[in-house]
């Protein structure tokens, strides 16, 4: 990573940012370009740190590889629907949060038997390897749910469309993007049952506190400028999704 404020566009002056490549509306790779709310926030932060868009290098950060990518220095920061948890903070540091999601369920449009997590006993539930979503459902709401893991959310959506599973669980904003991409074949239940603070993952080292403060300042600036709200609206267009106004926009003070 280059010194902040640099304007050179040489290869040495790149900032490497981990995102998801398979989450419509959040982090999505499409014909060599990147789009989604996480991408928009990442670009805003990088610009505030002194990097141009051309100096940003996006790298795929699958859920189960996020901590290792930060620890190994493969990326400078990760914005990949990365919930801040005490367990994760043992391995990495966080800035943010830049968004508070809520865990929800997605079902086929004609599904009538599933209206919340407590209806999942005996049902097949898909989540992504390395995420905490399905464990929450099994431990708190439906002990007899059958869990199925897939490498990505797109695979979970495909399993749902083909009838292999009965529901998909993850954060509401991710599900909203997947439902929009299904063109009406899938729907989100719309009753979030957790709060998931999305953080910017950074390497745990001597400079992480100073880095977190700079990132938090950038997020705060994005919220105040109206860009944050515009990014939400742009990336959930065509769905009924509205972020929970009780928690959003959040106060970014993690890691300071």
Language model region names:
Residues 1-3:
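C-terminal motif of bacterial Sec signal peptides marking the signal peptidase cleavage site
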Residues 11-78:
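Extracytoplasmic small-molecule ligand-binding "clamshell" domains
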Residues 40, 47-48, 111, 131, ...:
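Extended ligand-binding regions for polar small-molecule ligands
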Residues 55, 133-147, 188, 219-256:
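Ligand-binding clefts/hinges and TM-proximal coupling segments of bilobed small-molecule sensing domains
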Residues 56-68, 112-115, 148-158, 162, ...:
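Short helix-initiation/N-cap motifs at beta->coil->alpha
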Residues 57-119:
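Acidic, polar ligand-binding/catalytic clefts
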Residues 81-90, 136-139, 166-195:
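A ligand-binding cleft/hinge motif common to bilobed small-molecule-binding domains
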Residues 99-107, 176, 180-216, 238-256:
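Periplasmic-binding protein-like
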